[in-house]
Curated annotation (Swiss-Prot):
Protein name in the entry: Mitochondrial intermediate peptidase
Species assigned in the record: Coprinopsis scobicola (Ink cap fungus)
Active site location: 557
Name of the gene encoding the protein in the UniProt record: OCT1
Cofactor note: Binds 1 zinc ion.
GO biological process per UniProt: peptide metabolic process; protein processing involved in protein targeting to mitochondrion
């Protein structure tokens, strides 16, 4: 395949990618695992403190430079929605020229030597506009800009889909890989890149006979349509259930609960409660009577026959697609280029997790059963049902490990900047955006500054909710890193009458290029956007205080951002977060672990006047192990649904789910339920839902073995940067992890390595007291 735009991490990406590799020499150094914390804090700088004002007093920082006006993201041409449409058309012209150059390369040995580089250039040329358009589609408040973003996105993705199955491009690449002299001339980075390109073309059915390839295209189209239908069904509200006033007797909630009881008494009618509503959540937590909780659970996990049919058809089409290209199942096809490599390895990992988690989860379930026994004054331990979980173990909001003063957005960004300086010699610096550079007055611009090289990238922070903006938190890579001084653009050719369009596209790309000190070549520097929905500061109420889960979210997303900033590879297809699905969350999850350290939390104090120490703010939460076990079971379901058994005429997704829960689960399956139609990750993370658990396990191990005892140690930060972050997706993740942890036996990434990672999770998380 040619390329995959690098938009929101792991989401909303067209199935299309060109990828590259970086293989720079790694400096040798003595291994330095975590030791006693002896490193002193680096004092906060003026720039660090300026971050507080930037985000907590935005009225002071919204003045844009009117002496210098520009277009979106500093591109002078992008001043009007029409300019984005024009840019897409100009990019298409240049992409067609570059495609033709690659196709003609077989006529020249010199041109064949440029094929891998030109494939990456073609990918970057298209993705540079597609990724920008994707951000505009999801964040711009102007409808005309959104429409222009949609047009640009769809126009260039359509061309990408053509390239996906372009036999000529594949043939040219095969010519390179079948020529021993050319292969020998490729450095390891370029050779690995070529292999990845070849494998991706193979996945797109490129070598199939014409009729079979047409079937592949048809199935792919069906899968996209069914996927959209499945996601729509997953988010469709389930019908309400009737709850009698008498069933709400004794509600523990004295606020909403009292109001609901009064409503039922006043109307003299049953309450109609929608699953997932605030009322439903309150009843599940606070109703002593089991019946309303049971009814709400059944309603929340109901499905129509049509919804089940859509899911099962999607699963069958995926299985047919995989078998069309000679794979046993969709899981086999999907996992080929992941750390797991094959479904059997995922099974080894999940089995290890189950074996190690089950005792903790069973103990937790016994605690809940004892609570239920006492509540009902029963002579024996009762069975815990699915609707009992929230009542006997109500979820607590996440809390910091030690008491902290209120944390504002600016304070957290200041702490992040100080942490990055300690670890990597990199900091965040407020920058004034020019007039026209950002899409909304809320957006703040940050420079990412390396102490040796200066500015190495930019982060645009769009942190507050507004109408039309995408919900949730996300990290968008609008521009990837790559080396550009060896592009050889002069030999791309030209169509008659396209001079102005080519110039427009070239000028768009020229804005991105910079020469850094102490680094050979000219590079395109990364640019990312962070979207969140934090509370907005105001003049009357002052700076907005973040909930702890929002602090965790910010650290998580900034973990992705630093991966983009530090993973500056020569090939954009493997820069930053462009890596395997089951590896990409490691840097972001590891960032959350830093929030467990008092030394790191003290960085939120600009003047270092607060003494923080571990005093045991954690508490035992029996539901932590139960929830972990439930996540493992969902990962197992995902593997079953993408196994060869899907094509059996007797396959029934509900029966498969029920059998699995009753065989390996902790809480009995509830007849009549079909949760699988709401398991939206089955589409976006089909056969890879294990990835988050997998990366949590690795992150836990890295934290425990490398950082936990000295989290501000620069040597450890440099080690992690040099052995993991700087490579993006250009190096085998198993090699990176085994080197970082000094466990060479992991490098093979085989079944035993997967089992070993499964054991880590228990040692580092389930075995410890947790917070829910």
């Amino acid at each position: 395949m040619l390329a995959r735009p690098s938009t929101t991490v792991l989401a909303r990406r067209p199935f299309f990618r060109f990828r590259g590799c970086l293989n720079e020499p790694r400096p040798t150094k003595a291994r330095c695992l975590a030791t006693a914390a002896t490193h002193h804090q680096i004092p906060s700088t003026v720039d660090d403190k300026a971050l507080v004002d930037l985000f907590d007093q935005p009225s002071l920082s919204k003045v844009r430079s009117h002496f210098h006006s520009t277009g979106l993201f500093g591109h002078p041409s992008l001043t009007h929605p029409r300019s984005l449409v024009s840019l897409a058309e100009s990019t298409l012209v240049r992409a067609q020229l570059l495609t033709q150059r690659i196709l003609d390369a077989k006529e020249s040995e010199d041109e064949l030597a440029h094929v891998v580089k030109n494939l990456d250039r073609l990918s970057d040329m298209l993705c540079g506009v597609i990724d920008l358009a994707e951000l505009v589609r999801n964040a711009h408040p102007d409808r005309l800009w959104v429409e222009a973003g949609n047009h640009a996105y769809e126009t260039l993705c359509e061309f990408m889909n053509v390239l996906n199955t372009h036999t000529g491009l594949n043939d040219t690449l095969k010519t390179v890989l079948s020529n021993p002299t050319l292969v020998k001339s490729l450095d390891p980075e370029a050779y690995q890149t070529a292999l990845i390109f070849s494998r991706d073309f193979e996945k797109s059915g490129i070598d199939l006979p014409p009729a079979t390839r047409n079937k592949f295209v048809s199935l792919s189209s069906d899968i996209l349509i069914l996927g959209r239908q499945f996601l729509e069904n997953a988010s469709t509200p389930r019908p309400p259930t009737s709850v009698k006033a008498s069933e709400l007797a004794g509600l523990k909630d004295k606020g909403m609960g009292v109001r609901l009881q009064l409503q039922a008494q006043f109307t003299n009618r049953d309450l109609q409660v929608y699953p997932g509503s605030l009322q439903a959540q309150m009843i599940m937590r606070a109703a002593p009577n089991e019946e309303p909780r049971r009814k709400l659970y059944l309603a929340a996990n109901s499905s129509t026959p049509e919804q089940i049919h859509v899911l099962e058809t999607l699963l069958k089409k995926r299985a047919e697609l995989a078998q069309l290209v000679g794979r046993d199942s969709f899981a086999h096809m999907t996992l080929d280029d992941k750390m797991a490599k094959k479904p059997e390895h995922v099974t080894n990992f999940l089995d290890a997790l189950i074996d190690h988690t089950r005792p903790f989860a069973r103990n937790a379930l016994r605690t809940l059963a004892q609570r239920k026994q006492a509540h009902h004054n029963l002579p024996a331990l009762p069975v815990i049902q699915a609707w009992d979980r929230d009542f006997y173990c109500p979820p607590d909001p996440p809390a910091p490990p030690i008491p902290l003063p209120p944390l504002t957005i600016g304070t957290v960004f200041m702490g992040l900047s100080r942490l990055f300086r300690h670890l990597y010699g990199v900091s965040l610096r407020p920058a004034q955006a020019a007039s026209g550079e950002v899409w909304h007055p809320d957006v703040q611009k940050l420079e990412v500054v390396d102490e040796q090289q200066g500015i190495i990238g930019w982060i645009y922070a769009d942190l507050f909710p507004r109408r039309g903006k995408a919900s949730g938190a996300a990290h968008y890579t609008v521009r990837c890193s790559r080396r550009t001084d060896d592009d050889d653009e002069a030999n791309d050719g030209m169509f008659e009458g396209t001079e102005l369009q080519i110039q427009e596209s070239q000028q768009f790309e020229a804005v991105k290029r910079h020469r850094l000190p102490n680094q050979e070549g000219v590079y395109q520097l990364p640019l990312v956007v962070l979207l969140t929905e934090f509370a907005r500061p105001s003049l009357s109420k002052g700076a907005a205080v973040l909930e702890w889960h929002e602090v965790q979210t910010l650290f998580h997303e900034m973990g992705h951002a630093m991966h983009s900033m530090l993973g500056r590879t020569e090939y954009q297809n493997v820069s930053g977060t462009r890596c395997a699905t089951d590896f990409v969350e490691l840097p972001s999850i590891l960032m959350e672990h830093f929030l467990n350290s008092p030394a790191v939390l003290s960085l939120f104090d600009a003047d270092n006047t607060t003494s923080l120490r571990q005093i045991g703010n954690h508490h035992n939460d029996p539901c932590h192990a139960i929830d972990t076990y439930s996540q493992i079971m969902l990962a197992v379901v995902d593997q079953v649904y993408h196994s060869p058994s899907v094509l059996n005429s007797s396959f029934d997704s509900t029966n498969e789910f029920a059998n699995l829960v009753n065989k390996r689960g902790l809480i009995p399956y509830v007849p009549g339920t079909s949760f699988q139609t709401q398991f939206g990750h089955l589409f976006g993370y089909g056969a890879t839902y294990y990835s988050y658990l997998f990366d949590r396990a690795i992150a836990s191990r890295v934290w425990s073995k490398v950082f936990s005892r000295d989290p501000l140690n620069r040597e450890l930060g440099e080690q992690y940067k040099q052995e993991v972050l700087r490579w993006g997706g250009a190096r085998d993740p198993w090699e990176m992890v085994s080197t970082l942890l000094d466990q060479p036996e992991l490098a093979a990434g085989d079944a035993e390595a997967m089992r070993e990672v499964g054991r880590w999770r228990i040692e580092d998380e389930v075995g410890n007291s947790g917070r829910h």
